[in-house]
Curated annotation (Swiss-Prot):
SUPFAM superfamilies per record: Putative methyltransferase TM0872, insert domain, S-adenosyl-L-methionine-dependent methyltransferases
Organism for this UniProt entry: Burkholderia cenocepacia (strain ATCC BAA-245 / DSM 16553 / LMG 16656 / NCTC 13227 / J2315 / CF5610)
Family: Belongs to the methyltransferase superfamily. RsmH family.
Name of the gene encoding the protein in the UniProt record: rsmH
Entries under PANTHER family matching the protein: 12S RRNA N4-METHYLCYTIDINE METHYLTRANSFERASE, S-ADENOSYL-METHYLTRANSFERASE MRAW
Gene Ontology molecular-function annotations: rRNA (cytosine-N4-)-methyltransferase activity
Lineage start: Bacteria, Pseudomonadati, Pseudomonadota, Betaproteobacteria, Burkholderiales
Protein name from the UniProt record: Ribosomal RNA small subunit methyltransferase H
Length: 313
């Protein structure tokens, strides 16, 4: 219960206001979490509307089952399954898709989930602990090259190669020391390698982010769900995405820009601009948390919300 109480939904009012353009429409909350956005969306919807939410976390599913509203349903799966899951429910078009990316406060604050370096716990990091490979299992087999690429690309960590070598060296000591399977030891290994310190940031921050993104296939799933959302949105429907680090935001920004721009055509070809297909999206805005929200919830500090609208049928 304590974790539930500590969770604060970021950009709650702004996201819901941007999302709901048709009170009687069909909406998707791709990241139910602890239900802050879903409950606020339901409060704005008409009796005939529908809200379909997704989450991989079994605890989120438990929370969602407490919502006794005939307009609401929850899918225990990644938002990457959105297209097929909605088709199975007879939904061809939606009025809006909301994505609140990243890891939630209850997940970070629970040492047993293995997301945080701030408290020792099992090295898991899976959004759904019942599926897939844990962080410890991946670290037990990954090569120096794979470790380097993941930590460099997903953590933007300049000491990625040195960290990868240290992790493989630690693995060679498994017979004597046992497996590397706790967040505390991982943070300690990274701390010994990363000699420079970013103000206000633990040396292990980037490595933990990178491993979490890899274990959960977060960026690949994000690209899949953006494509799905574009095809599912009806004319006038909104795509609202909240991201918390530059890797996610870059993907969202480029996606929206690419689909809000006219296709590039060789100037030498005899094609008039009016004959080109119209871009499917219009970018509405980019928003950030207010100073008051950041003061009340420091984890909101890095949030960026981007909104786009489908303008073609």
């Amino acid at each position: 219960m304590g974790n539930e109480l500590r969770h604060r939904t970021v950009l709650l009012d702004e996201a819901v206001e941007s999302l709901v353009t048709r009170p009687d429409g069909v909406y998707v909350d791709g990241t139910f979490g602890r239900g802050g956005h879903s409950r606020a969306v339901l409060a704005r919807l008409a009796p005939a509307a529908r809200l379909i939410a997704f989450d991989k976390d079994p605890r989120a599913i438990e929370t969602a089952q407490g919502i006794k509203d005939a307009r609401f349903s929850i899918v225990h799966d990644s938002f990457a399954s959105m297209r097929d899951a909605l088709a199975a429910r007879g939904v061809e078009k939606v009025s809006g898709v909301l994505l609140d990316l990243g890891v939630s406060s209850p997940q970070v604050d629970d040492p047993a989930r293995g997301f945080s370096f701030r408290a020792d716990g099992p090295l898991d990091m899976r959004m759904d602990p019942t599926r897939g490979e844990s962080a410890a299992e991946w670290l037990a087999r990954a090569s120096v090259q794979e470790l380097t690429e993941v930590i460099r690309d997903y953590g933007e960590e300049r000491f990625a190669f040195q960290i990868a070598k240290a992790l493989v060296a630690r693995r060679a000591e498994s017979d004597r020391l046992g497996p590397l399977d706790t967040t505390g030891e991982l943070a300690q290994i990274v701390g010994h390698v990363v000699k420079t310190r970013e103000k206000g940031k633990d040396p292990a921050t980037r490595t933990f982010q990178a491993i979490r993104i890899h274990v959960n296939q977060e960026l690949a799933d994000l690209q899949v769900v953006l494509d799905a959302a574009l095809s599912l949105l009806e004319q006038g429907g909104r795509l609202v995405v909240i991201s918390f680090h530059s890797l996610e935001d870059r993907i969202v920004k480029r996606f929206m820009q690419a689909h809000a721009s006219a296709p590039a055509v060789d100037r030498r070809l005899p094609i008039r601009a009016v004959d080109l297909p119209s871009p499917p999206l219009k970018i509405i805005s980019r928003q950030f948390p207010s100073e008051a929200e950041v003061a009340a919830n420091p984890r909101a500090r890095s949030a960026v919300m981007r909104i786009a609208e489908r303008v073609t049928p």
